Amino acid sequence: MAAETLNFGPEWLRALSSGGSVASPPPSPAMPKYKLADYRYGREEMLALYVKENKVPEELQDKEFAAVLQEEPLQPLALEPLTEEEQRNFSLSVNSVAVLRLMGKGAGPPLPATSRGRGSTRSRGRGRGDSCFYQRSIEEGDGAFGRNPREIQRSQSWDDRGERRFEKPARRDGVRSGFEEGGAGPRKEHARSDSENWRSLREEQEDDGSWRLGAGPRRDGDRWRSTSPDGGPRSAGWREHGERRRKFDFDLRGERGGCGEEDGRVGGGNSHLRRCRGLDGFEDDKDGLPEWCLEDEDEEMGTFDASGAFLPLKKGPKEAIPEEQELDFRGLEEEEEEEEEPSEGVDEERPEAGGKEATPLPPPENSSSPSSLPALGPLWTTNEEGGEAVEKELPPAEGDELRGLSLSPRISSPPGPPGDLEDEEGLKHLQQEAEKLVASLQDSSLEEEQFTAAMQTQGLRHSTAATALPLSHGAARKWFYKDPQGEIQGPFTTQEMAEWFQAGYFSMSLLVKRGCDEGFQPLGEVIKMWGRVPFAPGPSPPPLLGNMDQERLKKQQELAAAALYQQLQHQHFLQLVGSRQLPQCTTLREKAAMGDLTPPQQQQLTTFLQQLQALKTPRGGDQNLLPTMSRSLSVPDSGPLWDLHTSASSQSGGEASLWDIPINSSTQGPILEQLQLQHKFQERREVELRAKREEEERKRREEKRRQQQQQQEEQKRRQEEEELFRRKQVRQQELLLKLLQQQQATNVPVPPAPSSPPPLWAGLAKQGLSMKTLLELQMESERQLHKQAAPREPLRAQAPNHRVQLGGLGSAPLNQWVSEAGPLWGGPDKSGGSSGGNLGLWEDTLKSGGSLARSLGLKSSRSSPSLSDSYSHLSGRPVRKKTEEEEKLLKLLQGIPRPQDGFTQWCEQMLHTLSTAGSLDVPMAVAILKEVESPYDVHDYIRSCLGDTLEAKEFAKQFLERRAKQKASQQRQQQQQQQQQQQQEAWLSSTSLQTAFQANHSTKLGPGEGSKAKRRALMLHSDPSILGYSLHGPSGEIESVDDY
């Protein structure tokens, strides 16, 4: 019988086989599923015959075909990439696929991850293995027809015509057997159509023996169930189930070409089939099996993404799982039909079969009861526990019976394609087999025992999922969900859940939880609680413990709000630190933290800070948030306040956390809104405070600048007054010196005019009075002076000085020149014409110095008042005649206090040029600039006068450079002047003694000789910078010089 089952397909197709031995590796296990008509060619055959370079036949190049002829032939759809719309259709949800199946539209969209007729390494059908489409010859026929689901979807017309040859591979798509009852029919139909071809051939050739009977010995011996592909004992893992189903699948297909097709075609007899199905040990078959049957059990454990693509956890390629999906699809059906044989691991493996397929479509919300079974297999594929985890969610044995019982209607639900007798015969045969399976299910006590044992082994895992897993557990951070049947599915990684969520598989009412959470919660509530999609990347809150009373829930919500509020405060604190407003920051933060909160909220905030201290080592994703906030809020590391743990932090044995309780969305919303309003209000108040501070700061700066300017002006004025006072003193000393010299030059007494009475002490001069009598006379003349002018203190301070100085020169000469100088000390000018020579000198000197002191109005100086009055008495009418010249000189001196140098002229010129408004007081600005010491103040003053322009900045820079040079030169000149002044003082003291001595003996000389001597004495070396002018000749001409 085995040999007969290898003879399949039409004779002409088998005749195409080129021979060859079984030892040569088959290009790919073939799987013919139909007896081909004479002119029906398989898809792969046509692809193999397709040559891209072929030109259009000449027969078609006629004009009558020109309207419909296209020069460039279109490539086969199998060679075309999928469009975006097709990709989108392939990622439809399970509901859409189920509807398509119910409508007879086929298996629905396949998985994008599978190859589309390109013969990838893991592709299904006859082409599995390492071969690809175009490595095989025509002899393979249509064997790989149903291998690639995407090829199917390229042309639905085949499916519409009822040719289900393409639909078996569609099991690779996201549709899982457990997710639809209606879809189970087409699924069964796939298996039926897959097997109808060889069955009809075999029935035609000899007896009606069932292909199921071929597998009978294998089932009786349970050989393939008890051993793994590598001969070792099996574990209860889903891979074991997959291997078992795979072998069964393979054997079924072996009859159709899985391993026997080559033998059938090349005439190799039944030796290969014997290897595949014989009773002599499964290990002997390994060399004849495809590589997908020989892999390690845990090689391809993994998960599926939203599109159904397999994400291996270890080293399996992505195509491996679509292959598994197809195998699992078949294996599940055939296993259901085969459950009359109670065996180990059947129940353990069955749910995994569907579960593996169910993974990409997690929430089967409209699926039938069996859907919950397969849905949980992959739950544990990510862990090494493998098999034990699978049975955790197995339904009771009644579920198995129900599923088995439902086989019969599912088998018969889709009618076979009309007109296909082989399909009809296959349907009848499968119905008979299903009835046998149903009968066997009713007395499968061994399976019930195995199921009970499996449930016991998974009891711990089940309880762990129901309660919170410790954080150290591998699945603590993975996700579980409850399907509509109440079964728990999982664990799934966050990435998987995110992909399924994006694909639209999850409704907001889906109950989800993490391994570390205690209870399930609707997905919508979790999103509200987390403030984001929980499957999106980001820090995850600590475990949510569900057995908390309402009081603690409320308190935890308040703490969460306080934490959020403190986070906002921390952000403001950092902003204020960045803006260097630390002094105001502390007060502001305290106000914001306490002033805006009600007393209960303040208490909650204090409680939260205590929790921060208690939770120095938070769990999970909070390891960064709370310590950072604790540091930012200056929470002390120790202290009596922080050593108090609240009940909320101690209830869970030190593991309490801010997130230990789910925050109710109804209370979260108002709290968040209130916090947002407070945040906005605080920002607005902060802006106002900042503006107010800036305004105050600006006012303070302006006031400081104004005060500084006033101080500078006051200092400038004082310096100018001091300078004028100093100059006045120097000029007065110089005038006294001149007067002394003049008296000495005219030491010959001139007889007074008869009409002019002599001075008070004129008669006493010749008698050689003592100094005491002289002083008394001088004091008497001073009393007369007080009668003529207002009494002034400086007169009594300085007049004795001059008298002491002059008195030290000797009594005789003093009597002589003091008698002539009476009017200087306030005596009445009664000398008339006899003093005309004196008047001529005063007229010259008053032009330069004497009248200046009076006109400048230095009333506060110590010596200027009496001297100016003396000058007016000495000069008399000639001085009044010079008033116009004095006024001109006064204006000049008032405008320019000191003679201008080159630096001052340059400053004024530049300021006139740069001053656009014309209202700038240039001399005053120059004077202020010259007195300002700080470069910053110079820049500030120039900016206030001229504006913040490049020209003003350049002027300030040049001004500072020139002023520095000028000051350096001034220092050098001052040093020279000090040296010269010292020399002059020494020389002047000696010269005064000499002149006094010469005056004392001048009576021995003639008038001409005496005048010559005095004229020589007039050649004094005076410092021009002190005097303001220099004397170069005996006539006493005045020449102005610069001060600098």
Curated annotation (Swiss-Prot):
Modified residues (Phosphoserine): S24, S28, S137, S157, S228, S343, S408, S540, S634, S863
GO CC annotation terms, alphabetical: protein-containing complex
Phosphoprotein keyword on record: yes
Keywords: Phosphoprotein
Biased composition (Gly residues): 829-839
Pfam families: GYF
Residue ranges of the region described as Disordered: 104-290, 306-424, 692-721, 820-842, 855-883, 966-987, 1000-1019, 1024-1044
Effect of Y505A: Decreases binding to GRB10
Tissue-wise expression: Ubiquitous. Lower expression in skeletal muscle, liver and testis.
Gene3D superfamilies: 3.30.1490.40
GO biological process: insulin-like growth factor receptor signaling pathway
Residue intervals of the GYF domain: 476-524
Entries under InterPro entries matching the protein: GRB10-interact_GYF, GYF, GYF-like_dom_sf
SMART domains linked to this entry: GYF
Effect of W500A: Decreases binding to GRB10
Regions of compositional bias (Acidic residues) in chain numbering: 333-350
UniProt biased composition (Basic and acidic residues): 148-179, 186-203, 237-265, 316-332, 389-403, 692-706
Biased composition (Low complexity): 366-379, 855-877, 970-984
Keyword Metal-binding: no
Quaternary structure and interacting proteins, as annotated: Interacts with GRB10. This transient binding is increased under IGF1 stimulation and leads to recruitment of GIGYF1/GRB10 complex to IGF1 receptor. Interacts with DDX6.
Functional note: May act cooperatively with GRB10 to regulate tyrosine kinase receptor signaling. May increase IGF1 receptor phosphorylation under IGF1 stimulation as well as phosphorylation of IRS1 and SHC1.
Family: Belongs to the GIGYF family.
PANTHER family membership: GRB10 INTERACTING GYF PROTEIN, GRB10-INTERACTING GYF PROTEIN 1
Protein name in the entry: GRB10-interacting GYF protein 1
Source species: Mus musculus
